[in-house]
Regions:
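Cell-wall glycan-active module
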Residues: 1-179, 266, 274-310
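Surface-exposed patches in mature extracellular/periplasmic domains of secreted proteins
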Residues: 122-126, 185-193, 206, 251-262, ...
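Amphipathic alpha-helical interaction segments
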Residues: 105, 109, 193-196, 241, ...
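Basic- and aromatic-lined ligand-binding clefts that recognize polyanionic substrates
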Residues: 198, 202-205
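Short, conserved phosphate-binding/catalytic loop or strand-edge motifs used
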Residues: 197, 212, 219
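Alpha-helical segment that forms one wall of the substrate-binding/catalytic cleft
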Residues: 168-183, 189, 202, 215, ...
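Glycine- and aromatic-rich loop/turn segments at beta-sheet edges
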Residues: 205-211
Length: 310
């Protein structure tokens, strides 16, 4: 039995959803497996513009609500973020320290836009219809995944009790995902999507109300069965344990069945699959999601707990 915290992906909210999980075997490759997605959809930019087209947004920069202004803002932010990620991954060190400031600020602004769109389906439809084709497909995925998880949201009564910490560098985490993929056959994008959804890549340290612990949110009994003798709080051990559990539950043959055993909530499964599919389409999205921050929903509104300016 295991259950996950509900750190809602797309930085929407933190909520706790208790669930009981078991084991099942699956025998078919799902059509929506992340491995089935083509990376040809991703827009690459080997000659990416080295200069941002506009000043970097402040951490709490105003977001326009009019679709004819919000769509260009999301389009420009996404393109600038892709270029900043290209520079970081080719000229910087993704295995040491934190992301460059431009990546952090652009990712946060993008995340805040998607939070707004996930709460307003009509606005989202209008904005996405105005986006360039290379951004629109990514936007549809992010809005849908965010909406999935928003449906599970519940307010946190005491956000001050939620403990956070800096995550491992993305290059280090990617190495852990690939090691787990090589050992258990679970796509690294699925592991990254679970890690993101459960704890924002390890930013959230607190256990869930159901007692789930660590960056992949295991309850003790499930960890004892699938944790391979490791430390549930260690990112490397937790990622391998998650891959072991997903493999035992049907992955890679049927990711949906495996994820449903991980957390038997259809909206959760849909969200994880969507984020994984987007990272398969464009691996740069992993670095964007990595820089999306922790938000919690309170009775007074949403509150950001991590990231620039705090």
């Amino acid at each position: 039995m295991r259950r996950l915290t509900a750190l809602l992906a797309a930085g929407l909210v933190v909520s706790v959803v208790a669930a009981s999980c078991g084991r099942a075997e699956a025998r078919r490759e799902p059509a929506d497996s992340p491995r089935a997605a083509s990376s040809s959809d991703a827009t690459t930019s080997p000659q990416a513009d080295r200069r941002l087209s506009s000043p970097l947004p402040e951490p709490d920069a105003w977001i326009p609500r009019a679709p004819d202004r919000l769509a260009p803002a999301l389009d420009a932010t996404t393109r600038s973020l892709r270029s900043a990620i290209d520079r970081w991954t080719t000229e910087g060190d993704v295995s040491s320290g934190e992301a460059p400031l431009d990546v952090q600020l652009l990712a946060l602004y993008q995340q805040r836009i998607y939070r707004m769109l996930a709460r307003d389906p009509a606005l989202a439809d209008d904005v996405v219809a105005r986006l360039s084709s290379s951004v629109a497909k990514e936007a549809r995925i992010n809005v849908a995944a965010g909406s999935n998880l928003l449906s599970l949201a519940s307010p946190v009564s005491r956000p001050s009790l939620i403990r956070t910490q800096p995550p491992e560098p993305p290059g280090v985490l990617l190495g852990f995902y690939r090691e787990a993929e090589d050992r258990f056959g679970v796509a690294w994008q699925v592991l990254a999507a679970v890690n993101y959804t459960e704890s924002k890549f390890g930013r959230v340290v607190s256990a869930s109300s159901a007692g789930a612990q660590g960056p992949m949110q295991f309850i003790p009994s499930t960890w004892a069965a699938y944790g391979l003798g490791g430390d549930v709080h260690d990112p490397h051990d937790a990622i391998l344990g998650a891959a072991n559990y997903l493999h035992a539950s049907g992955a890679p043959g049927n990711y949906r069945v495996a994820l449903y055993h991980y957390n038997p909530v259809p909206a959760y499964v849909d969200a994880v699959m969507r984020y994984a599919r987007q990272m398969t389409r464009d691996p740069r999205t992993f670095y964007a999601y990595y820089n999306w921050q922790v938000f919690v929903l309170t009775k007074h509104g949403e509150l950001r707990l991590t990231g620039p300016g705090l």
